[in-house]
Amino acid sequence: MPSRIDATFARARAENRSVLVTYVMSGDPDPETSLEVLKALPGAGADILEFGLPFTDPMADGPAIQAAGLRALKAGQTVSGTLDLVRRFRAGNDTTPVVLMGYYNPIHTYGVDRFLDDAVAAGVDGLIVVDLPPEEDAELCLPALGKGLAFIRLATPTTDERRLPAVLANTAGFVYYVSITGITGTATPDFGKVSEAVARIRRHTDLPVVVGFGVKTGAHAAAIAKGADGVVVGSALVDALVRSLDGEGRPQAGSVGAVTELVRELAAGVRSAGVGRAA
C-alpha cells in the first residue's frame, strides 16, 4: 500500500498538476486555533501539510516563522501537544499527509525512540529536520525510515554536484528545494534559476521535487509549479494569520478564513500551471 505522500503525488500526476504544500506552526496563536487551521487546509486546496514544531532558536526561519514559534511557545505548545493535535486531525482526515518540520533539539529532548513511536501512532507521515546533515543520519533519519516515516531533506542553491548524492542518499517522500539562500520569507525566487535547479536535482533522483521559500502569491505558485512537482508556502500563510489577530494577538472569527482564502488563491495558481513533471 503506498504511503499517503506517495499517493498524493500519484494523484496529482494523474490530474496533470503539481501539489500544494502548506506550512503552519503548531500552537500558533494557540493550540486550538492551529488545529482548526490544519483541519481547514485540505478543503481549501492544500495537498500536503507541514506542521511546525516550535523551537526557541529557529536559525533557518525568518521573522514571521520565528514570531509564530514564540507565540506557540508562549501559548504552551510542546512536542507532545503537537503530536496530540495531529492525532486529533487524523480523527477526521486519514488521507492528507502531515509532515512535522523543525529542529532536532526538541526531538532529542523528548527522546528519539519515544518521539518516533508517538509520531507514527499519531499519524505523522514524514519529518523535515533542518539542522541534521546527512553525516548525522544515524541520529534520527535512519531510525525514522525504519519506522516507516519519510525523512525529507533540503537541497539549496549551494548544494553542488559533489554534495547532492549525500543529501539524497536517505531522503524519502520528496526533496525540498530551498529556492533562496538565507532565511524563510525574505525574498522572491528567480523562477528561471529555480527550474534549472529542479532539473539538476531530477538528474540524481526519481523522488518528487518541491520548491519553497519566497512563495507569496498565486502567481508565484503558478510560476514554480510549471517546473516542479510541488510548491511550498509557509511565511505568507503565517503572515495572513497574524494580520487576522486582534491587538493582543488573539484569534478572531475570521482568522481561519484569512489563511484558507490565501490557500485557495495559491491552489488555483498551482492547478492553473499544468503538470510539473512529464508523466
Curated annotation (Swiss-Prot):
Quaternary organization: Tetramer of two alpha and two beta chains.
Keyword S-adenosyl-L-methionine in annotation: no
Gene Ontology CC entries for this record: cytosol
Function: The alpha subunit is responsible for the aldol cleavage of indoleglycerol phosphate to indole and glyceraldehyde 3-phosphate.
Reactions performed catalytically: (1S,2R)-1-C-(indol-3-yl)glycerol 3-phosphate + L-serine = D-glyceraldehyde 3-phosphate + L-tryptophan + H2O
Source species of the chain: Methylobacterium radiotolerans (strain ATCC 27329 / DSM 1819 / JCM 2831 / NBRC 15690 / NCIMB 10815 / 0-1)
GO molecular function: tryptophan synthase activity
Record pathway: Amino-acid biosynthesis; L-tryptophan biosynthesis; L-tryptophan from chorismate: step 5/5
Protein name listed in UniProt: Tryptophan synthase alpha chain
Keyword Repressor: no
Gene name of this polypeptide: trpA
EC number: 4.2.1.20
HAMAP family listed in its UniProt record: Trp_synth_alpha
Swiss-Prot/TrEMBL keywords: Amino-acid biosynthesis, Aromatic amino acid biosynthesis, Lyase, Tryptophan biosynthesis
Gene3D superfamilies: Aldolase class I (3.20.20.70)
Active site positions: 50 (proton acceptor), 61 (proton acceptor)
Family, per entry: Belongs to the TrpA family.
